[in-house]
Design a protein with these regions (language model features):
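Short S/T/G/P-rich N-terminal loop/turn motif that feeds into the first structured element of a domain
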Residues: 1-50, 54-68, 75-94
Length: 94
């Protein structure tokens, strides 16, 4: 079942976001294995990211094998992060 992971970093900037992507992805437009969609934007008071994964297992593998070992990233996100996650029960596209 597809899985959604959302992170919000209060006070984070686009520069923090780009530093994290550079440290954790193989390229700026190459999604990690299992990630289907990636959305990110500045909210005015931080960075909000929502990633859609093919499964919770793929998401967990990325977090455990790539994201956590890469931390802390120089110039990356400040802590703490606000996290929400869910299995996707409805997916409608135009």
């Amino acid at each position: 079942m597809t899985y959604m992971l959302s992170h919000f970093w209060p006070g984070a900037t686009e520069e923090n976001y780009r530093a994290e992507v550079a440290a954790c992805w193989t390229g700026p437009t190459t999604l990690p294995a299992g990630q289907i969609h990636h959305f990110a934007g500045h909210t005015g008071d931080g960075i909000l990211i929502t990633a859609i994964w093919d499964s919770k297992e793929s998401c967990d593998r990325f977090v455990q094998e790539i994201l956590i070992p890469a931390q802390p990233v120089e110039g990356g996100f400040p802590n703490p992060v606000e996290e929400n996650a869910a299995e996707i029960s409805n997916d409608i596209s135009a």
